[in-house]
Design a protein with these regions (language model features):
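Short, solvent-exposed recognition segments
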Residues: 126-199, 268, 274
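N-terminal helix-turn-helix
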Residues: 1-84, 251-255, 282
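Extended hydrophobic
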Residues: 175-246
């Protein structure tokens, strides 16, 4: 591969072809199409593709002759990605926020139609939360963290979650579809979810989404505190600190992190019994 790369202009051209392939990964790309995308001749592009294929980074369908990045390429990317999972990546942010704000901080991650508490840093004030302890879960749309995640999902996914979860969120006694959609739009406009939902008496919270490189919400940072501590004067400061940490974490997320698909596997114990129950039920 080294000789071929040197003859055709080196590493920049190789990466140009890789980027062009990533843009057509679903359908695959032909030599002519890829050559136009990178501004090289077909002969040069073909040599680069063959060199990448020889290294196992590119594969060509025998029938269609279309090129795609190979599974070996993605396996290499996963291995070279951020070695820490989302929980490890966010732990310093939780500690900083807890120390700065003096309140309990939660890391929630999406798990199908739910949000799961992946980590928390306890503040000095006794509070209740929708997920309870680490491992607790709640329907997407219920509580600030789960609402922040739902609001910033791609539209098609968001609609699917709303349809599935509507009957679940109604169990809390204050939600209907109009209310939920209004809240989602409000969160999208403000960039955060909060403050007092009225579901937990005396409690308040605010959350911001953690977005991956594609702008998709994969998690949320949330503050849980007593209502008196989240007044109009303090809210902007809390939101700003949350957003700053979320923006710093987002670009570092490893898209191959198993936590994003199966968060329970990253927990030493999953305790969904500690989640806040719908209206009329006591937290265990």
């Amino acid at each position: 591969m080294e000789a071929a790369s040197t003859a055709t202009g080196g590493v920049p051209r190789v990466f140009a072809v890789i980027r062009a392939l990533s843009a057509v990964q679903a359908e695959g790309g032909r030599v002519t199409q890829l050559a136009r995308a990178v501004g090289l001749t077909q002969a040069t592009t073909h040599r680069l593709l063959q060199s990448l294929a020889a290294e196992g980074m590119v594969e060509q369908d025998e029938r269609s002759k279309l090129y795609r990045l190979s599974m070996d390429f993605f396996a290499l990317a996963a291995k070279a990605g951020n070695p820490g999972d989302l929980r490890s990546l966010c732990r310093p942010a939780l500690l900083r926020l807890c120390a700065s704000l003096g309140d309990s901080i939660f890391l929630l991650v999406r798990s199908g139609f739910d949000a799961v508490c992946l980590d928390r840093s306890e503040g000095p004030f006794p509070i209740r939360s929708f997920t309870g302890d680490i491992g607790g879960r709640v329907a997407l749309g219920v509580g600030q963290g789960a609402l922040a995640i739902l609001a910033f999902l791609p539209e098609a996914e968001r609609e699917e979650v709303i349809r599935f979860n509507l009957s679940r969120v109604r169990e809390y006694g204050v939600f209907d579809e109009v209310y939920l959609r209004t809240e989602i739009e409000r969160v999208r406009q403000l960039g955060y979810a909060g403050r007092n939902t009225g579901l937990l008496e005396g409690m308040a919270g605010v959350a911001v989404p953690i977005l991956d490189r594609e702008g998709r919400a994969v998690a949320a940072l949330s503050v849980g505190t007593i209502s008196a501590r989240l007044n109009d004067d303090r809210l902007p400061t809390v939101v700003e600190l949350l957003k700053r940490e979320a923006l710093a974490v987002g670009p570092k997320i490893n898209p191959f992190d198993v936590t994003l698909r199966r968060p329970a596997q990253s927990l030493s114990s999953v305790r969904p019994d500690q989640a806040i129950q719908p209206a009329g039920q006591e937290q265990k």
